[in-house]
Swiss-Prot record:
Belongs to the pyridoxine kinase family. PdxY subfamily. Pyridoxal kinase involved in the salvage pathway of pyridoxal 5'-phosphate (PLP). Catalyzes the phosphorylation of pyridoxal to PLP. It comes from Pseudomonas entomophila (strain L48). It catalyses: pyridoxal + ATP = pyridoxal 5'-phosphate + ADP + H(+). It comes from the Bacteria. This is Pyridoxal kinase PdxY. Pfam families: Phos_pyr_kin.
């Protein structure tokens, strides 16, 4: 029997709705990965509602929880760590310590960093210290980095001017540590208005993917968390980088189609669960020559 992969997911949790682990855990489980959720914050709802209740996890709890898993002999079974929204830079450093602890017992374990700083339509949504931590410390430790356009621009200290420029900026990030950069949402001058564009860059290749841009009165939150989670899950299940890229794009589109059909502000993960596991649509990534 083929072994089921295990992934430690360290990011936010909301009681109502879908963001952070609340957007990523169930879909990753649905495609066949055992997920260990470690919630950096527990909020009543995501912050784009404008009000919320809850609290941030004390940074010291992160290594304590990782050590607790070690104490029962399971830490070596962790195949990957995924981190997302951080409540503080101190939390981020605790996560890096946890990643190092896991890699010490399983050198093949991967670390995917979703460097949540902001969104083009929402601006910066984390404290300055968190952005500084991501820009200066996390990038060097990540095997896979999954920024959006705003975050890619922040890493490089300037705005991208074209698709080719985005590729060059992603290649610059590869020189700082990661082996894969997945730009979850491209937003550069001259891009198509009716398409949602994504980019995958490795040391050898670059791939561009377009899918239809769906209209919403308010853009659902958690799409990036869902994308990063599904990409990591499919890699653990044996997909190539490009296969995982294409699968994540298709599965996310299926969720958005269901969300749009329900006229919902929250991602409709449960209603779309069968199409997450087996997307009916397929988007083919195009290899770029630069």
């Amino acid at each position: 029997m083929k072994r089921t992969p295990h992934l430690l997911a360290i990011q936010s949790h909301v009681v109502f709705g879908h963001a952070g682990n609340s957007a990523a855990v169930f879909p990753m489980q649905r495609v066949g990965v055992n997920v260990w959720p470690l919630n950096t914050v527990q909020f009543s709802n995501h912050t784009q509602y404008g009000q919320w209740a809850g609290e941030v996890l004390a940074p010291a709890q992160i290594p304590a929880l990782v050590e607790g898993i070690s104490n029962i002999g399971e830490l070596g079974n962790c195949d990957a760590v995924l981190s997302g929204y951080l409540g503080s830079a101190e939390q981020g450093r605790a996560i890096l310590a946890g990643v190092a602890r896991i890699k010490a017992v399983n050198p093949k374990a991967l670390y995917l960093c979703d460097p949540v700083m902001g969104h083009a339509e929402k601006g910066c949504i984390v404290p300055a210290e968190v952005s500084e931590f991501l820009l200066e410390e996390a990038v060097a430790k990540a095997d896979i980095l999954c920024p959006n356009q705003l975050e890619l621009d922040s890493f490089c200290g300037r705005r991208a001017e074209s698709l080719e420029d985005c590729v060059g900026m992603a290649r610059g990030l590869l020189e700082r540590g990661p082996r894969i950069v997945l730009v979850k949402h491209l937003n550069y001058p001259g891009r198509a208005d009716d398409a949602f564009e994504m980019l995958l860059v490795t040391g050898e290749e670059s791939w561009h993917l377009r899918r239809p841009l769906l209209a919403f009165p308010r853009q659902p939150v958690g799409v990036g968390d869902l994308t990063s989670g599904l990409f990591m899950a499919r890699l653990l299940l044996g997909d190539s980088d490009v296969q995982a890229f294409e699968f994540a794009a298709a599965a996310v589109h299926e969720v958005l189609l269901e969300t749009q059909a329900c006229a919902s502000y929250e991602l409709q993960l449960v209603r779309a669960q069968d199409r997450i596991a087996h997307p009916r649509v397929r988007f083919e990534a195009q290899r770029l020559l630069y």
